Curated annotation (Swiss-Prot):
Transmembrane segments: none annotated. One of its GO terms (biological process) is DNA transposition. GO terms for molecular function: DNA binding; transposase activity. Keywords: DNA recombination, DNA-binding, Transposable element, Transposition. The keyword DNA-binding applies. Required for transposition of transposon Tn3. Disulfide bonds: none annotated. InterPro entries: DUF4158 (IPR025296), Tn3-like_transpos (IPR047653), Tn3_Tnp_DDE_dom (IPR002513). It comes from Escherichia coli. The keyword DNA-binding applies. This is Transposase for transposon Tn3. Belongs to the transposase 7 family.
Length: 1015
């Protein structure tokens, strides 16, 4: 069902070109704006001198217009009637020509146009599309096609821009599209060839066996390997390790893949994971082998990550179960403990009687409590009383039976490595790898460095022997902590590898060092940075202290053990009658719309569906693809599945078409690009610009129950009850658009938000440039404050108890008046000086995308013994957190702004909840990719709703002004596009639009349509 060339212009292929690209290539699509007229059609004195050589006004105007056209369009026009009137008048005025109708004479002789084109090419050094320019463009396109999987439409735009930049006359669209197709095909064939040559003959035979059934299942081995773990248990871990081992045994992991483009490998592997075994078997031998190699290489890493995720989750379950068992034991033993404590208290009271002689105390105590009874009480207390640092390790040791089911697989299969801080854990791992298969009950020669004080009594018995059970559980507890800090890591794993190895290093760091310092805006001398911070902090302390007496919202409370500030809650803003009236008028004007039509209408405005391209055949286009894409997005976002949207009599909505579209077009990269289109379009709307400039955003999580078995979910009784769930962490700009070019991050359970704040900010791909991020308390930590400052961002969380926070000072002797009592923390700038270059190297690595922010932050946050780098980042974070706190208590408008932005995020979540109405709003995808794709679709559809509302609210405002209404700018700034009562998300789903709406026109506002009796 590939598109055929248009009958209107058969020489222009539209296999991959959008309608907009077809209509705009070498043509005017409307009147150029003032900036474009000034840039491309302005004639300087040299131009006028050249033009003056032509005889007659018609020739002078004609050649002048051709000069402007070749600058603006990249080519000459044969029909001057296609030049907009504004361009003709603008050019004629510069030449002093009053009557532009003389232009009709210019088109009478074709030779004149040809001669003028030749003169312009010669005078302005324009060139035909020929050698060496064909070679240079081909080389550029080939390089881009080789390293990335860019859509051919993007390559077409790139090629057009490159040709115009180098003053090459645009060739026919057919020539350019054919060149792009040939180049992309050549790059693809090269990738297939290189991948197919990696395996040996024996390995190729083994890879072909992936397509055949396994011994114990009708499924092919490939299909079996696609299925990751869905439960958290010892057997599930063993199966996950066997899955990784099967992929690892192909022996492809050791090959040098540094010369192959990572993005294209990833896309090819994803395609292998989505398509059927039948489709792979039908491929050419070279492509089939390339797909299988890419699958094994990618899934080997994924399988190892999955196995380690199961291990981490399983250890967490063991610890949680041990805690539950311990707490139950504690409750059952409380009566005995209370009884024994009272008896001991009575016995000890005899020791305090002054009248009893020392030599008689023992006899008097035993007269009250017999010696044997007292010994029994003491024994009982020792058994059931727990030290203050108890972590239910006794109950963990009781879980040994669960551990021994999976530990041999762990020790014998996974190869751990370590940083210096993890050497002791690695030594213990190596020891257990050698000794665990023995039947020894005591490991007296085991490394003891991992045995902490709280574990000692459980690991070392009364006879001073190191017990097998105690040591094993102690090791697993230490291993989990070391893995989470990445002191111990697994080479070959993406999520559990060594983040330090991904930082800028060696020659790479030295080559980029000065650029990184400049881009981050920090001086190379740490003393300069510290001096600047010290000046800011000192002046801010003094300003806030001077105004504190006038600040009625803040009081200094000295009644407690430590002085603290109390901050009055913000009073709700009154909603004036004018705002209520304006909101009501706009609400009444918004026309009702089905969500299906809304998506198609937003596509007519933005063309977001053009960002969806086939996973392996990017040039493939089918008729009415936007309809199919909108249907699939609707199915995912509304959580209703494809079934309600299938129409057997509509080619774009058949079961086969929708399944094919979902499998080949819906994925993170396409959703991200489409989402960026919506966000960028929203930023151009005048109403959105009134709400904000895109410099501010908030981050928050939206919780979803996951009732299916999956390892990518976690427990939290507050949000999920007795179930498990996930958190969709997403960002909302001050223009109400949701972003992170990334559509959101899916987090198992409710992990700390602070781990993911920076990741979303750094990876977002929209045109917005947020520099200030607002979060709830959960997203705040000294480390995050420090990283934000290093990267040049302002972190503005809403702290639950800001007045009780520690305020830090840099000058120990400075007098801050009434704030002296709360400025208790003393920062240590020496730590910053010692680690300054390392701090900037880390920040630069994050900025350049060398390391994933969540991985790095997680490893830094988990450390019980922070490294010098972590301490330095925390130190600079404390200073910046204090600057934030001083601003927070001093400026009510600042507090109000934070609250307003966070409320926008919560209101947007309410719209998303309304959209995701199917299956009780529960996410039933088992694997991370499926969860991310579905919630990405939800974010995209939510953005479409926000954009549609903004467009029609703008139209409603224009309508009200035209009717003579006086509108208050302050009221307009408080309007919100987060409404959905007029949008139908249920019932019969229709994907048809009125012709005018399809062409980008707005549907009538409700009031106007009722007046004209338009449905």
């Amino acid at each position: 069902m590939l598109k055929k060339p248009s009958g209107r212009e058969a020489d222009m292929p539209v296999d991959f070109l959008t309608t907009e690209q077809v209509e705009s290539y070498g043509r005017f699509t409307g009147e150029p704006d003032e900036l474009q007229l000034a840039r491309y059609f302005h004639l300087d004195e040299a131009d006028k001198e050249f033009i003056g050589k032509s005889r007659g006004d018609h020739n002078r105007l004609g050649i002048a217009l051709q000069i402007g056209c070749v600058r603006f369009l990249g080519t000459f026009l044969t029909d001057m009637n296609h030049i907009p009137s504004g361009v003709r008048h603008f050019t004629a005025r510069q030449l002093g020509i009053r009557d532009i109708t003389v232009l009709a004479e210019y088109g009478q002789r074709e030779n004149t146009r040809r001669e003028h084109a030749a003169l312009i090419r010669q005078h302005y050094q324009y060139r035909e599309f020929a050698w060496p320019w064909t070679f240079r463009l081909t080389r550029l396109l080939y390089t881009r096609s080789w390293i990335s999987n860019e859509r051919p439409g993007l390559l077409f735009d790139l090629a057009t821009g490159w040709l115009m930049q180098h003053r090459i006359i645009l060739p026919g669209a057919t020539t350019l599209t054919r060149l792009i197709s040939e180049v992309r095909e050549k790059a693809t064939l090269r990738l297939w060839n290189k991948l197919a040559l990696i395996p040996s003959a024996e390995q190729r035979s083994q890879l072909e066996m992936l397509l055949g059934p396994t011994d114990c299942s009708r499924l092919s081995l490939l299909e079996s390997l696609k299925k990751g773990p869905v439960t958290i248990s010892g057997p599930a871990f063993n199966e996950a390790i066997e899955r990784w081992k099967t992929l690892n045994d192909f022996g492809l992991h050791a090959e040098n893949l540094s010369t192959l483009p990572a993005v294209r490998l990833k896309n090819l592997a994803r395609y292998a994971g989505m398509t059927s075994v039948f489709n792979i078997a039908r491929m050419s031998p070279q492509k089939r082998m390339a797909v299988l190699v890419a699958f094994v290489l990618a899934w080997e890493t994924l399988a190892l990550d999955d196995a380690l995720e199961v291990l981490d989750a399983m250890l967490a379950v063991i610890i949680r179960d041990a805690r539950k068992i311990g707490q139950k034991k504690r409750l059952r033993s409380l009566k005995d403990l209370d009884k024994s404590a009272l008896a001991l208290a009575s016995a000890c009271s005899y020791l305090l009687k002054e009248e009893t002689p020392d030599e008689s105390i023992r006899a008097e105590v035993f007269s009250y409590i017999p010696r044997q009874k007292l010994a029994e009480i003491i024994t009982l207390v020792r058994e059931i009383a727990r030290p203050s640092d108890d972590n239910f390790h006794d109950e963990m040791v009781e879980q040994y039976g669960r551990v021994r089911r999976f530990l041999p697989h762990l020790l014998n299969t996974v190869k751990f490595s370590s940083a210096p801080a993890g050497v002791t854990t690695l030594n213990a791992c190596d020891y257990l790898s050698r000794e665990f298969s023995s039947r020894r009950q005591f490991f007296d020669d085991a490394p003891t460095e991992i045995i902490s004080q709280s574990w000692k009594r459980l690991v070392i018995n009364k006879e001073k022997h190191i017990t097998r059970r105690g040591y094993t559980l102690c090791f697993l507890s230490k291993l989990q902590d070391s893995l989470r800090r990445r002191d111990v890591y697994v080479t070959g794993s993406n999520r559990w590898g060594d983040p330090r190895a991904r930082l800028l290093q060696g020659a790479d760091w030295q080559a980029n060092r000065i650029k990184v310092y400049r881009s981050l805006g920090h001086p190379t001398d740490p003393q300069e940075a510290i001096k600047s911070l010290g000046h800011q902090l000192d002046s801010r302390y003094r300003q806030v202290a001077a105004r504190l007496g006038e600040n009625e919202a803040v009081e200094l409370d000295v009644s407690g053990p430590k002085p603290r500030l109390t901050i009055s809650p913000l009073a709700s803003l009154d909603e004036p009658d004018s705002l209520k009236r304006l909101s009501k008028m706009i609400s009444d004007l918004l026309p009702p719309v089905d969500l299906t039509e809304l998506l198609l209408e937003i596509n007519a405005h933005t063309g977001f569906a053009d960002e969806f391209f086939h996973a392996s055949e990017a040039s493939a286009r089918v008729d009415d693809l936007p309809v199919s894409i909108s249907a699939v997005l609707m199915a995912e976002a509304c959580n209703i599945g494809l079934e309600p949207l299938i129409r057997s009599n509509v080619p774009a909505l058949t079961r086969h078409r929708l399944n094919w579209t979902k499998a080949n077009y819906l994925r993170a990269e396409t959703i991200t690009s489409a989402n960026a289109r919506l966000v960028d379009f929203q930023a151009t709307l005048p109403l959105a610009q009134i709400w904000g400039g895109g410099e501010v955003a908030s981050a928050d999580g939206m919780r979803f129950v996951t009732p299916v078995r999956t390892i990518n979910a976690g427990p939290n009784r507050k949000y999920f009850g007795n179930n498990r769930g996930i958190t969709w962490y997403n960002f909302v700009s001050d223009q109400y658009s949701g972003f992170h070019g990334f559509h959101g991050i899916v987090i198992p359970g409710t992990l700390r938000d602070s781990i993911f704040v920076l990741e979303g900010l750094l990876e977002q791909e929209t045109g917005l440039n947020p520099t200030e991020i607002m979060t709830d308390t959960a997203g705040a930590s000294d480390l995050v404050f420090g990283l934000f400052w290093l990267l040049g961002y302002q972190f503005s969380p809403r702290l639950a108890d800001a007045g009780a926070s520690v305020f830090w000072r840099m000058d120990h002797d400075a007098d801050y008046g009434v704030l002296n009592d709360i400025a208790r923390g003393q920062s240590d700038p020496r730590k910053i000086v010692l680690q300054w270059d390392e701090m900037i190297r880390t920040a630069g690595s994050l900025k350049l995308g060398k390391v994933q922010a969540s991985v790095l932050v997680r490893s830094l946050l988990k450390s019980e013994r922070p490294s010098g780098l972590t301490q330095a980042i925390i130190e600079v974070g404390r200073i910046n957190k204090t600057l934030y706190l001083l601003n927070y208590i001093d400026d009510e408008d600042y507090r109000r702004r934070i609250l307003t932005q966070l409320n926008r995020g919560e209101s947007r979540h309410a719209v998303a909840r309304a959209i995701c109405h199917g299956q009780k709003g529960e996410i039933r995808k088992r694997y991370t990719d499926g969860q991310e794709d579905q919630l990405g679709a939800l974010g995209l559809v939510t953005n479409a709703v926000v954009l549609w509302n903004t467009i029609y609210m703008q139209a409603a405002l224009d309508h009200l002004r035209a009717q003579g209404e006086t509108l208050n700018d302050e009221d307009i700034a408080r309007l919100s596009p987060l409404c959905h009562g007029h949008i139908n998300m249920l019932g019969h789903y229709s994907f048809t639009l009125a012709e005018l709406v399809t062409k980008g026109h707005l549907r009538p506002l409700k009031e106007a349509s009722e007046a004209e009796n338009v449905a």
